[in-house]
């Protein structure tokens, strides 16, 4: 997950992952590593954080992550049995 320290949507994404029992999130802080922002934009086509991947699948930002959860599609992506 590409993120910054001051991003409320990044914090929401982390809370949602935590609530799902995800304990390991690879965080790439583009505020601390500005050169990684270009990488993020190239990979995602977006400029905003968070940009979230689950394995090799680009999810998008927090809104897309939350929509997957509401639709019941996040748990299978995380390998959580229904």
Feature map (PLM): residue ranges:
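Short alpha-helical
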Residues: 8-9, 35, 60
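Thiol/disulfide oxidoreductase modules built on the thioredoxin-like
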Residues: 42-48
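Non-catalytic, surface beta->alpha helical segment in thiol-disulfide oxidoreductase systems
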Residues: 54-81
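Thiol-based oxidoreductase modules, predominantly thioredoxin-like and allied folds used
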Residues: 23-37
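Mobile, glycine- and charge-enriched loop segments
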Residues: 1-5, 77-82
């Amino acid at each position: 997950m590409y993120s910054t320290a001051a991003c409320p949507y990044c914090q929401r994404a982390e809370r949602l992952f935590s609530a799902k029992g995800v304990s390991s999130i690879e965080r790439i802080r583009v505020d601390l590593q500005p050169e990684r922002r270009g990488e993020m934009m190239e990979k995602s086509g977006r400029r905003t954080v968070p940009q979230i991947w689950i394995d090799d699948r680009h999810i998008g930002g927090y809104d897309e992550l939350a929509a997957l959860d509401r639709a019941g599609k996040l748990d299978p992506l995380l390998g959580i049995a229904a």
